[in-house]
């Protein structure tokens, strides 16, 4: 069977940057576990705030966390109360000084994490899986996507045998490295077990910046 490489990992260093921006040698394992703890904690604390990518940068005894969210007001809170509480909890969790940047997602319908999360939450509320996918596709195309593909897998409608069913519209060129494709995978916890939700969104081409070489044309 043909297997598909992770669309984001394949494009790192070409048109996408790393979500973790730090370098370490002996401390690598410790930093990696700390990153996982930070991401899991933020996802749990901000479960209703439509958070997507979490970027982590490191300096000496300082951690800079950039949270991409569609609801910045909910994350910041009244007079910054929520973000201050979150910063204090992360300081305690890591034992380091944590700085938090809040970045607003202008078009949540073009973010694969948020689209996948929306489909998963609808499936948990017993919305038909075909309807949830088709509505998400329509919203993404109206928001300006060049193409979108979704897939839901598991015991669909409580069937005894698990299967996968997906829909797509437009083009999703997975082999084109300059194609800006956002990908995400989410889970829905239903009475019949877990359902997996995959989303690919093609947002257009990104041409990597040309490097100036001495004496080059």
From Swiss-Prot:
InterPro entries: KH_dom (IPR004087), KH_dom-like_a/b (IPR015946), KH_dom_type_2 (IPR004044), KH_sf_prok-type (IPR009019), Ribosomal_S3_C_sf (IPR036419), Ribosomal_uS3_bac-typ (IPR005704), Ribosomal_uS3_C (IPR001351), Ribosomal_uS3_CS (IPR018280). Keywords: Ribonucleoprotein, Ribosomal protein, RNA-binding, rRNA-binding. GO terms for cellular component: cytosolic small ribosomal subunit. It comes from the Bacteria. Residues 38-106 form the KH type-2 domain. Transmembrane segments: none annotated. GO terms for biological process: translation. GO terms for molecular function: mRNA binding; rRNA binding; structural constituent of ribosome. It holds the Pfam family KH_2. NCBIfam families: rpsC_bact. Belongs to the universal ribosomal protein uS3 family. HAMAP family: Ribosomal_uS3_B (MF_01309_B). Part of the 30S ribosomal subunit. Forms a tight complex with proteins S10 and S14. This is Small ribosomal subunit protein uS3. It comes from Streptococcus suis (strain 05ZYH33).
């Amino acid at each position: 069977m043909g297997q598909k490489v992770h669309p984001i990992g394949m494009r790192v260093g070409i048109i996408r940057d790393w979500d973790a921006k730090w370098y370490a040698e002996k401390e690598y394992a410790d930093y990696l576990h700390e990153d996982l703890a930070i991401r899991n904690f933020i996802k749990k604390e901000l479960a209703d705030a439509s958070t997507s990518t979490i970027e982590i940068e490191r300096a000496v005894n300082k951690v800079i966390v950039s949270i991409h969210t569609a609801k910045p007001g909910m994350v910041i809170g009244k007079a910054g109360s929520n973000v201050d509480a979150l910063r204090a909890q992360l300081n305690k969790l890591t034992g380091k000084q944590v700085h938090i940047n809040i970045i607003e997602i202008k078009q949540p319908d073009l973010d694969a994490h948020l689209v996948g999360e929306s489909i998963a939450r609808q499936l948990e509320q017993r919305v038909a899986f075909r309807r949830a996918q088709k509505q998400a596709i329509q919203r993404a195309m109206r928001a300006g996507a060049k193409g979108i593909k979704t897939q839901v897998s598991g015991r669909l409608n409580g069937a005894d045998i698990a299967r996968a069913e997906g829909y797509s519209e437009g083009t999703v060129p997975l082999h084109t490295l300059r194609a800006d494709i956002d990908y995400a995978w989410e889970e829905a916890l239903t009475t019949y077990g877990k359902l997996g939700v995959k989303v690919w969104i093609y947002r257009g081409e990104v041409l990597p910046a040309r490097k100036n070489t001495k004496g080059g044309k």
